Regions:
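HTH-adjacent hinge/linker in prokaryotic transcriptional regulators
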Residues: 2-19, 45-46, 56-139, 167-190, ...
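Short helix->loop/beta-hairpin flanking segments within DNA-binding domains
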Residues: 17-35
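A short alpha-helical element within helix-turn-helix/winged-helix DNA-binding domains
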Residues: 29, 34-47
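Short, acidic, Ser/Thr-enriched surface-loop or helix-capping motifs
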Residues: 39, 148-149, 236-237
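Helix-turn-helix DNA-binding motif, specifically the short coil turn and the N-cap/start of the second
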Residues: 50
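C-terminal regulatory/effector modules of DNA-binding transcriptional regulators
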Residues: 134-135, 152, 161-262
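Phosphate/anion-contacting hairpin/loop surfaces
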Residues: 156-158
Length: 262
């Protein structure tokens, strides 16, 4: 009896075989970041396939974020070494208490850039008020920004803090730094500590999903790339919430690492 090939029992489509070969060459380093990949004509000649098949093979790599098409020039390898995000270590007081930015834990030796920082007092969404235990109509200080590594956007973040945390101390150095573009050594958590609201406990919730159109533009995501949506609450030793941070990460740019004892 003849068996009709299916995705379960038949060979993979030719365009996927071509894509797999190119993928392996990118990951093995035979094509370095920025190298031009074989074009449609080269693939047609090498594999004896139609133009549509060659185009599909390149599209697979583009959709996976391993290649980028430059109009009028060709398709180029795009190999980004993922950031290793150390879940607990980056938030330890030992880190930000010593004056380090928590981002320094993630970005190894590559460093990072902060872009588009906007600081403003706003009336936030209802869920933000609820998490920060604020009454309806209350305002918060909102700090919105985007982070880049090697010139690539990898994350956007929006922090919310209650102005009550520095009420009566608006002219203090810590309060001024919280409202400034440069929050100083150790960042916001070090400034909260100086104001008597030391973060002692953090809660993070993470889920993977597909991005909104706005997120795709902001993070310059390739089609089909998921994001990691994170909600983090910082609390004092008395479990009083002092900051709520909403973070969107390029899912292809991160490895999440959690170290803990059994």
């Amino acid at each position: 009896m003849n068996v009709v090939p299916t995705s379960e029992n038949g060979p993979p489509p030719v365009y996927r075989e071509i894509a797999e070969e190119l993928r392996e060459r990118i990951r093995s380093g035979r094509y370095a970041d920025g190298d031009r990949l074989p074009g449609e004509n080269s693939l047609m000649e090498r594999y004896g396939v139609a133009r549509a098949t060659a185009r599909q093979a390149l599209s697979v790599l583009i959709n996976e974020g391993l290649a980028v098409a430059v109009r009028g020039s060709g398709v180029y390898a795009r190999l980004f070494r993922p950031l290793r995000r150390h879940g607990a270590r980056r938030l330890s007081k030992e880190s930000w208490g010593s004056g380090r930015a928590i981002w320094q834990t993630d970005s190894d030796t590559r460093g990072y850039e902060v872009e588009g920082l906007v600081i403003e007092e706003v009336t936030p969404a209802e869920h933000v008020l609820r998490i920060l235990e604020l009454p309806e109509g209350a305002t918060v200080l909102r700090r919105s920004r985007r982070y880049l590594v090697d010139g690539r956007p990898v994350q956007s973040a929006v922090s919310h803090l209650s102005p009550h945390l520095w009420e009566g101390r608006e002219d203090s150095e810590a309060a001024r730094r919280i409202r400034a573009h440069d929050s100083g050594p150790g960042g916001i958590y070090a400034r909260l500590t100086e104001l008597g609201h030391t973060p002692a406990h953090f809660t993070e919730e993470i889920r993977a999903r597909m991005p909104t159109p706005e997120e795709s533009v902001e993070l310059e995501l390739f089609p089909g790339t998921p994001v990691l949506e994170m909600a983090r609450t910082a609390l004092t030793g008395h479990h009083r919430p002092v900051e709520f941070n909403e973070i969107i990460m390029d899912g292809s740019a991160y490895v999440l690492q959690y170290d803990f004892d059994a």
